[in-house]
């Protein structure tokens, strides 16, 4: 049995709202090992902000403020990118905050992950196994859905080697002992989202 991280999802999902500075502070107070936040670019001013959903996001916290808080508290962040074409701006802000070695980048597609790694090799990046297939695949029905998941989970070790990612993030219902073995065989970590009950967490830890 290996090491397990407790990662606060979207800061820490309470009545304080998702992806807020107050949530980050609460996660720090509760002793989380890491904090996951969602990152987008705000339309009005181009600022990188903490937000899961599309929209104006005028009141969303700035990423730079979250980075400053995390650096002061000495806690790492998992930045889950919710759109593409953020690489250069993201790397610049991480360097300015001196957080390049204290973050893990997930989401946004493996192409963006590879480009971030090219721009700044010190940043760790993750390969996200999708929960759903694309709309055009969905139209082909259940059989293709099964095949799609097999492609991703059947030989994920080869995908890791091809993309040079440090870890895999996967929806907890897709996790199997075989998948865990393949990820570890590739020298990578497996991160699971988002189990919310003790029984599911215990089952995953036992793998």
Model-based region annotation:
Residues 1-207:
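Phosphate-group recognition and catalysis centered on beta-loop-alpha active-site segments
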């Amino acid at each position: 049995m290996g090491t397990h991280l407790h990662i606060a999802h979207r800061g820490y999902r309470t009545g304080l709202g998702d992806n807020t500075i107050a949530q980050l502070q609460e996660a720090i107070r509760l002793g989380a090992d890491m904090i996951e936040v969602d990152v987008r670019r705000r339309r009005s001013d181009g600022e990188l902000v903490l937000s899961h959903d599309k929209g104006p996001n005028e009141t969303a916290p700035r990423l730079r403020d979250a980075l400053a808080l995390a650096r002061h508290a000495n806690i790492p962040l998992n930045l889950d990118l919710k759109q593409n074409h953020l690489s250069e701006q993201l790397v610049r802000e991480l360097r300015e905050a001196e957080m390049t070695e204290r973050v893990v980048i997930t989401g946004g597609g493996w192409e963006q992950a590879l480009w971030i790694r090219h721009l700044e090799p010190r940043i760790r990046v993750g390969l996200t196994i999708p929960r759903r297939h694309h709309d055009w695949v969905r139209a082909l029905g259940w059989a293709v859905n099964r095949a799609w998941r097999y492609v991703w989970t059947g030989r994920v070790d080869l995908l890791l080697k091809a993309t040079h990612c440090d870890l895999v993030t996967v929806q907890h219902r897709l996790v199997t002992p075989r998948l865990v073995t393949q990820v570890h065989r590739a020298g990578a970590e497996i991160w699971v989202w988002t189990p919310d009950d003790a029984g599911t967490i215990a089952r995953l830890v036992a793998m």
